[in-house]
A protein has these predicted regions:
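Flexible, glycine-/charge-rich segments associated with ATP-binding catalytic modules
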Residues: 2, 78-181
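Conserved beta-strand-loop-beta-strand hairpin that lines the nucleotide-binding pocket
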Residues: 2-7, 13-69, 73-108, 133-142
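Short, hydrophobic/amphipathic alpha-helical packing segments
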Residues: 8-9, 116
Length: 181
């Protein structure tokens, strides 16, 4: 994948398939500690220990439509290529947490990409679900929560094209103002 927003899209699609109703995404930039942390948490059905152990194997997938599942293995590989780490925690009935720590200054760390477009797309395509996105850096913090957006819309669908465009611009402009990399 060419940027982190595409990894985020892939992981969140897994969360949606697992029946999650709330999916939280966090990014923490810390150049002083040379870390760029991506964390995605959901309240989906979770995984048993056997599935959890196999989840980062590219030749394992719970899907019946294909025989490989590259999302988690590619994210793990991209984190480790920068000197970072990857962890996957899950408990049946409670949800799953994916955490990738990248070397902040490493030349192979992927750019964030169009996170506003990804979050707006996911929110519009899944109006019954709730998404949060938080981004923290030394330059500031940004929080986005579809529950707040839905409240402000007063009956207008979060799937409306103008709302989608607004969410994308809101997220990307705020991230641009605080992103250090």
């Amino acid at each position: 994948m060419k940027d982190l927003s595409l990894h985020i899209l892939d992981i969140i699609q897994n969360s949606i398939s697992a029946g999650a109703s709330l999916i939280q995404t966090e990014i923490n930039e810390n150049p002083e500690k040379d870390t760029y942390v991506l964390k995605i948490m959901d309240d989906g059905k979770g995984m048993n220990n056997e599935t959890l152990q196999k989840a980062v194997d590219p030749f394992f997938t719970s899907r019946t439509t294909r025989k490989v599942g590259l999302g988690l293995p590619l994210l793990k590989q991209n984190a480790e290529r920068t000197g970072g780490t990857f962890s996957l925690l899950s408990k049946q009935g409670e949800g799953t947490t994916v955490k990738a720590i990248f070397g902040y200054k490493h030349i192979d760390r992927l750019p964030l990409g169009d996170i506003g477009g990804v979050m707006a797309l996911l929110s519009s395509a899944n109006p019954a679900l709730d998404f949060t996105y938080s981004h923290h850096s030394a330059e500031g913090d940004f929080e986005f929560d579809t529950r707040e957006v839905k409240t402000e819309l007063e009956g207008v669908s979060i799937s409306h094209a103008e709302v989608n465009r607004f969410m994308k611009e809101l997220i990307n402009e705020n991230i641009k103002s605080i992103e250090q990399s």
